[in-house]
Swiss-Prot record:
Superkingdom in the source lineage: Eukaryota
Sequence ranges assigned to domain Inhibitor I9 in this UniProt record: 36-118
SUPFAM superfamilies in alphabetical order: Protease propeptides/inhibitors (SSF54897), Subtilisin-like (SSF52743)
Protein name: Subtilisin-like protease 7
Annotated Pfam families: Inhibitor_I9 (PF05922), Peptidase_S8 (PF00082)
Keyword Signal among UniProt keywords: yes
Organism: Trichophyton verrucosum
GO biological-process terms attached to the record: proteolysis
GO molecular-function term, one example from the UniProt record: serine-type endopeptidase activity
Documented EC number(s): 3.4.21.-
Entry annotated with the keyword Glycoprotein: yes
Root EC class: hydrolase
Length: 400
């Protein structure tokens, strides 16, 4: 499998309706987290009503523990308040408590929390990369990256991943630590996030060589995390970007899994907040319509191409794919210094996030509309892109 974060196979089947609230059902074989759920509130809920609902949940949960001798559950853990209005929470509840929550008229739906993890398909040190040259040229086989000297200056890229080695020489002091929603180690002990960050803003490997990089850690040293933790990272990035200027921000999510309405809604909230979001299509060689957050239409979904301008054999495809970008045997930074070669739609996606940052530096505007700009600039070269899939490969418009 490709080096993309993947929920082992988490797929949305039917949605059952219990007294007004949907409890999303998952197919057999899903690796859900025992007794852990994500609850999403109705659209337009006020902060006051949300606080009232949360108080009711906490009171009811405590009473259950005391009166009924219910087995110990952690109750509510994370609360989500996206600036665009999406509200919800996640926590550890037994079935009876979830049934009580589902009866509430202010609940939109409930989804089982699930595990996410990353899988590498190849790794080789110190091999020349080709992706940058391809982004800056209209013909394959080049060895030079042509780009404007602004190089994304003034833009900020939020890398929602395993963290970033912010001390790596590639970042020249432009990388900072943002937030951690998975463990107590503010470092990239996996390597995936540093590689992604290097492709966006590294001085050698980056598409936008002067952009700032912010590490948002949602996956641990084993590349494992949860949908609920990823959503926390998405919320934090949205709020931080809005405080600093969303029109100067891009976000990268080289992760995903099978369909999750909660993940899609959170991705849509990032876009609604004015931040350009690039997401990996997935590495299962299937239609990305069943993947999340890749299937969210308001974001920029990226498939992976080869050096010969073909579809990478692992890459997902389909109508939800917006563009192709180099994703096979890509060289970028690794924690502790130096570089490594990785493949996957995880590697394609930061080329697009980096191009978004690059265009911001050129004064082309920001926000989710950048995806349309990138598609307009793309070149029609991908061979055998897959059923109902674009054949457009990204290009930075340098004219070479």
């Amino acid at each position: 499998m490709g080096f993309i974060t993947k929920a082992i196979p988490l797929a949305l089947a039917a949605a059952s309706v219990i007294n007004g609230a949907e409890i999303m059902e998952t197919r057999a074989g899903v690796q859900t987290l025992a007794d852990k759920y994500i609850v999403v509130m109705n659209d337009g809920m006020t902060d006051k009503d949300f606080d009232s609902h949360r108080s009711w949940v906490n009171r009811t949960h405590r009473r259950r523990l005391i009166r009924r001798g219910a087995k110990a559950m952690g109750g509510m853990k994370h609360t989500y308040r996206f600036p665009t209005g999406l509200k919800g929470y996640s926590g550890h509840f037994d079935e009876q408590m979830i049934n009580e929550i589902s009866k509430r008229a202010d609940v939109k739906y409930i989804e089982r929390d699930a595990r996410v993890q990353i899988n590498a398909i190849e790794q080789q040190d110190n091999v020349p990369s080709w992706g940058l040259a391809r982004v800056g040229s209209k013909e394959p086989g080049g060895t030079t990256y042509y780009y404007d000297g602004t190089a994304g200056e003034g833009s900020t890229a939020y890398v929602i991943d395993t963290g970033t080695d912010i001390q790596h020489e590639e970042f020249e002091g432009r990388a900072t630590w943002g937030a951690n929603f998975v463990d107590d180690m503010d470092m990239d002990c996996n390597g995936h996030g540093t590689h992604v960050s290097g492709t966006i803003g590294g001085k050698t490997f980056g598409v936008a060589k002067k952009s700032n990089v912010v590490a948002v850690k949602v996956l641990d040293c084993n590349g494992s995390g949860s949908n609920s933790g990823v959503i926390m990272g998405m919320e934090w990035a949205t709020k931080d970007a809005q405080q600093k200027g969303a029109d100067k921000a891009v976000a990268n999510m080289s992760l995903g899994g099978a369909f999750s309405q909660a993940s899609n809604d959170a991705a849509a909230a990032i876009a609604q907040g004015g931040v350009f979001l690039a997401v990996a299509a997935g590495n299962d060689n299937v239609d990305a319509a069943d993947s999340s957050p890749a299937s969210e239409p308001s974001i920029c979904t990226v498939a992976a191409s080869t050096e010969q301008d073909g579809k990478a054999d692992f890459s997902n495809f389909g109508q939800v794919v917006d563009v192709y970008a180099p994703g096979d045997s890509i060289t970028s930074a690794k924690p502790g210094g130096g570089s490594q070669v990785l493949s996957g739609t995880s590697m394609a996606t930061p080329h697009v996030a980096g191009l978004g940052a690059y265009l911001i530096g050129l004064g082309k505007g920001g926000g989710p509309g950048l995806c349309d700009t990138i598609k307009q600039m793309a070149i029609d070269v991908i061979q055998n892109p897959g059923a109902s899939t674009t054949s457009k490969l990204i290009n930075n418009g340098s004219g070479m």
